[in-house]
A protein has these predicted regions:
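Function-dense linear segments that define catalytic or interfacial modules
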Residues: 64-172
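Conserved, charged catalytic cores of large soluble enzymes
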Residues: 4-94, 167-172
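Metallocofactor- and cofactor-centric catalytic cores in central/energy metabolism, strongly enriched
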Residues: 1
Length: 172
């Protein structure tokens, strides 16, 4: 509901993710617009289903991929906990309870996500790409090091220092 209200320049400036059980049919029908009577604020979230085995998914899940409502993301929460961070799979991460709104980054309770993006069409050389990546890393690292308003957030953010740097514009 907040995302419906927070609009600037005709663009929604918020994001949220909803994680639901694979066998919760009401949740799986939350964006079935063809059924009618669904509040339009439900369009504001990215809905994903938590499931460890795709064989457990009911037919209702696949309906979004067949044009009935919206397709849902698929989250394997146990794998996220078991494997830990990318590149550090030898360290399990039992604190993971959720994800940022697009599920690029696993998060513990009270934790924030810290993401940056490199837009390749603006990069003219490999040297510049490396320079931009280093700057973004430093910016992320510094933003994660600042004092937070909520003590639980500060503790978990400073302990994990989770960040991500994405690359976009590859085909341009």
């Amino acid at each position: 509901i907040i995302g419906k209200i927070v609009v600037a320049g005709n663009v929604r400036r918020s994001a949220q993710i909803a994680l639901g059980d694979h066998d919760d049919l009401d949740y799986l029908r939350a964006k079935r617009w063809d059924l009618g009577g669904i509040p339009n604020w439900r369009a504001m979230s990215n809905n994903s289903v938590v499931c460890d085995d795709i064989d457990q998914l009911p037919d209702e899940f696949w309906g979004g991929y067949e044009g009935n409502g919206e397709p849902y993301g698929l989250i394997n929460l146990e794998a996220s906990r078991r494997m830990g961070r990318t590149g550090e799979m030898q360290y399990p991460d039992p604190d993971v309870m959720g994800y940022n709104p697009c599920a690029e980054q696993s998060l513990a309770p009270f934790e924030t996500c810290c993401l940056a993006e490199i837009y390749l069409p603006n990069i003219e050389s490999e040297k510049e790409l490396k320079k931009v990546a280093v700057y973004l890393y430093r910016i992320n690292k510094h933003s994660l090091s600042i004092k937070c308003a909520v003590k639980e957030t500060e503790d978990i953010v400073h302990r994990h220092m989770r960040m991500g740097i994405g690359v976009t514009g590859y085909l341009q």
